[in-house]
Amino acid sequence: MNESAVRLRSVTRSYGRAGGEVKGLDQVTLDIPRSTFTAVMGPSGSGKSTLLHCTAGLDRPTGGQVFLGGTELTGLSERRLTRLRRGRIGFVFQAFNLLPSLTAEQNVALPLRLAGRRPERAQVLEALEQVGLRERARHRPGELSGGQQQRVALARALVTRPEVLFGDEPTGALDSTTGRGVLGLLRSMVDDGRTVIMVTHDPVAASFADRVLFLADGRIVDELYAPSAERVAARMARADGTVRAVSAPAGAEAPARAEAAPC
C-alpha cells in the first residue's frame, strides 16, 4: 500500500455566521498516495480552491484534520505552519508572481532566502535544469515568454525539494501547446517520485493526472482513475447537465501510464 502524502479527515470549512453560513468544504475525507498526480475539478463555487488551500496549509479548516505525511497541520502554530510550507510544500499558481527586477536564478532562490537558508547556486541551477531553463538563468521575466516564466515559477517551487507540489490552474494563462509542456513537466516530476495536486477547469490538463476528483457543494461527488480528456469532459457535462465537446489540439493526449487501482 502506497503511503499517503496527504490525508484529510472530515474536513469542513465554513464562512459567515450561524443562519447565513456557507460551507466551502463539507465533511471531506480523502487520501492522496505519494508519487501520484491528482487533479481537482468542479464548477465555480464547488470548493476546489478551498480544498487546495486547506490541504496546503494556506487556510485553516473550521473542523476536521489535515495531515502532510505524519504531520497534522491543523494543530500547528502559524510560525510552525509557515516553516513547514517553506520546506515541505511547493506552490505554482496561474499568475507567475515573478519579481520583474530579479533574474530567473534570483527568483528561484527566493524560497531558500525566505526560509533563512543561504542559496547554493548549484541547487538553484539544478531546479532550472529540471524545467529546461538553465541557460536562461540570468534572464529577467520580461525577457522570457509566458511558458518560460511559468517554468521559472515551477523551478522556484521545486528548489526546496518539497514533498508535495500544489498547482492552482498552473496552465490557465498559457496557450495549449505551452500548457502541455508544463503539464508534461509535472507528469515527469510525479514519475520521479513527487506528489502533485492540481486544480483545473481543463479536461486536457486533467488527463495528465492519475486520478481526478470532482467536487460539488463542498463535497467530493465522484472520482475518475486513469482519465482521458474525453472521459473527464463527459463527466463534467453530466454534472452541468450540458453537452460539451472536447476540442483537444493535435498531440494533446497525455503520456501513457499504468492505470491506478482505487485504494
Predicted regions: what they are:
Residues 19-22, 73-90, 114, 191, ...:
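ABC ATPase NBD coupling module
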Residues 64-72:
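Conserved ABC transporter NBD signature motif
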Residues 102-110:
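Short coil-to-helix segment of the ABC ATPase nucleotide-binding domain corresponding to the Q-loop/switch region
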Residues 140-150:
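Conserved ABC ATPase signature
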Residues 161:
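Conserved catalytic motifs of ABC-family nucleotide-binding domains
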